[in-house]
């Protein structure tokens, strides 16, 4: 009988997890269905930074017969997930929140909200700042006689890779705050390692962007600035731990 009672909480959690995952899937499907009619318009919007700087008369191409149909559909599915992120995060939060203490909830609320905003900011930065600069540079430096005709599927893969790279890298402040909050490191220790972190930012930029110094620099510089922002905000999360440690030391000295 006791084994049955002990298994009940686990079964309850699994049922709740299934229900929340089902809600996430339904949300993404509904958004996708609402957007699928506009799939070609969505692709044109994403491709606009490239088509705006292409030479007169140049167009994008499709090297496979099924590509013009499946590529916009693929993009629409990804956009549906992208739009659904706040709801998906809410479902995740609703599942794990009951296991957290009240002070942990107060600390995580702003982190969860800001991480979502930072990811969206990273994607927007890539689209409105990086794409026009990179595509303009590439089209202007093309050898004479070379016609730019980018495959629509290759462009989508390229754009999604940059969107993901910039979105993730804009989470640097959140990573720093979590590292300092959990006691893995401190603001002072990270500040002392600043030269190495700058080098690491350019190395990460080299790995996540196309093989050119221009794209690498456009990713590394925001990462360095966001690193400084993370250090600034992390100071508000760390002192409480320091104060509690000092109090514990004082109490231990008094008992001795």
Swiss-Prot record:
The domain of life is Bacteria
Name the PROSITE patterns for this protein: TATC (PS01218)
Q: Name one GO cellular component term.
A: TAT protein transport complex
- Carries keyword Cell inner membrane? yes
Q: Which GO terms describe its biological process?
A: intracellular protein transmembrane transport; protein transport by the Tat complex
Annotated TM spans = 25-45, 77-97, 117-137, 158-178, 195-215, 217-237
Task: Tell me which InterPro entries the record gives.
Answer: Sec-indep_translocase_CS, TatC
Record-linked Pfam families: TatC (PF00902)
* Topology within the bilayer: Multi-pass membrane protein
Chief location of this protein within or outside the cell: membrane
Any idea which UniProt keywords this protein has? Cell inner membrane, Cell membrane, Membrane, Protein transport, Translocation, Transmembrane, Transmembrane helix, Transport
Q: Where in the cell is it found?
A: Cell inner membrane
Give this protein's Gene Ontology molecular function annotations: proton motive force dependent protein transmembrane transporter activity
Q: Which family does it belong to?
A: Belongs to the TatC family.
* PANTHER family on file: SEC-INDEPENDENT PROTEIN TRANSLOCASE PROTEIN TATC (PTHR30371), SEC-INDEPENDENT PROTEIN TRANSLOCASE PROTEIN TATC, CHLOROPLASTIC-RELATED (PTHR30371:SF0)
**Subunit-level organization:** The Tat system comprises two distinct complexes: a TatABC complex, containing multiple copies of TatA, TatB and TatC subunits, and a separate TatA complex, containing only TatA subunits. Substrates initially bind to the TatABC complex, which probably triggers association of the separate TatA complex to form the active translocon.
Purpose = Part of the twin-arginine translocation (Tat) system that transports large folded proteins containing a characteristic twin-arginine motif in their signal peptide across membranes. Together with TatB, TatC is part of a receptor directly interacting with Tat signal peptides.
* The protein, known as: Sec-independent protein translocase protein TatC
Origin organism of this chain?
Answer: Haemophilus influenzae (strain ATCC 51907 / DSM 11121 / KW20 / Rd)
Gene expressing this chain: tatC
């Amino acid at each position: 009988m006791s084994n049955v009672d002990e298994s009940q909480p686990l079964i309850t959690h699994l049922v709740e997890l299934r229900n929340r995952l089902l809600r996430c899937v339904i949300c993404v499907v509904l958004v996708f269905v609402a957007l699928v009619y506009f799939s070609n318009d969505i692709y044109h919007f994403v491709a606009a930074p490239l088509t705006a700087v292409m030479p007169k008369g140049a167009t994008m191409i499709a090297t496979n017969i099924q590509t013009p149909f499946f590529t916009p559909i693929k993009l629409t599915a990804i956009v549906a997930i992208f739009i659904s992120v706040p709801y998906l995060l809410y479902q995740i939060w609703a599942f794990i929140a009951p296991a957290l203490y009240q002070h942990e909830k107060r600390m995580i609320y702003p982190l969860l909200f800001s991480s979502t905003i930072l990811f969206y900011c990273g994607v927007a930065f890539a689209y409105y700042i990086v794409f026009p600069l990179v595509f303009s540079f590439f089209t202007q430096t093309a050898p004479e006689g070379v016609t730019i005709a980018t495959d629509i599927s290759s462009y989508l893969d390229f754009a999604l890779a940059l969107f993901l790279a910039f979105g993730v890298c804009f989470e640097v402040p959140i990573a720093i705050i979590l590292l300092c909050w959990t006691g893995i490191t401190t603001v002072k220790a990270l500040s002392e390692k600043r030269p190495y972190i700058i080098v690491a930012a350019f190395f990460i930029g080299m790995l996540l962007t196309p093989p050119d110094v221009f794209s690498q620099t456009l990713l590394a510089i925001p990462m360095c600035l966001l690193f400084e922002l993370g250090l600034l905000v992390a100071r508000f999360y760390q002192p409480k731990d320091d104060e509690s440690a000092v109090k514990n030391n004082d109490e231990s000295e008094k008992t001795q």
